[in-house]
């Protein structure tokens, strides 16, 4: 990632952090920059009921606010769904993998339907329990693993993404 792009993502991160703090959402949504780009991490408990892929109505405004800032840039945006490793028991989804994918797809659909995103710049991915950020042995770790990551991809991935869809 070049210096110009890094500054652009850092400015976007600062803008998001301020907006989230002003809305009291900074405990439920966090941001960081890593080698992939700007990562916006959403705590699933705020945005989804357990075992459900439907975005909670009271959380839609936060997603729309975040999307409004992201819609000003040209980068690809990948929405990743993640779960803990506890098997689903009462759900329309046979596995955590399918649940995580459905959640990612619903966030992408919201970005398109309510925020006028271009569908060709959005990617929905479900990882289920297979990319944890914390230990699934504790309740706290499982809670951290239940998340949606909205990633503003570094432009170094643009050519790769365009080649994959050809």
Protein language model features and the residues they cover:
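Short beta-strand elements
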Residues: 25-34, 75-81, 123
């Amino acid at each position: 990632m070049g210096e110009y792009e890094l500054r652009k993502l850092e400015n976007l991160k600062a803008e998001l952090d301020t907006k989230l703090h002003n809305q009291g959402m900074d405990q439920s949504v966090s941001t960081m920059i890593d080698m992939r780009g700007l990562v916006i991490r959403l705590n699933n408990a705020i945005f989804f009921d357990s075992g459900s892929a439907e975005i909670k109505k009271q959380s839609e405004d936060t997603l729309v606010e975040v999307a409004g800032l992201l819609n000003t840039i040209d980068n690809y945006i990948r929405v990743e769904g993640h779960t803990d490793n506890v098997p689903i028991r009462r759900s329309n989804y046979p596995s955590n993998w399918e649940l995580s994918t459905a959640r990612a797809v619903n966030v992408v659909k919201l970005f398109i339907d309510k925020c006028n995103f271009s569908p060709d710049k959005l990617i929905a991915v479900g990882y289920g329990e297979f990319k944890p950020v914390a230990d699934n042995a504790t309740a706290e770790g499982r809670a951290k693993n239940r998340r949606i990551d909205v990633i503003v991809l570094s432009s170094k991935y643009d050519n790769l993404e365009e080649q994959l869809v050809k």
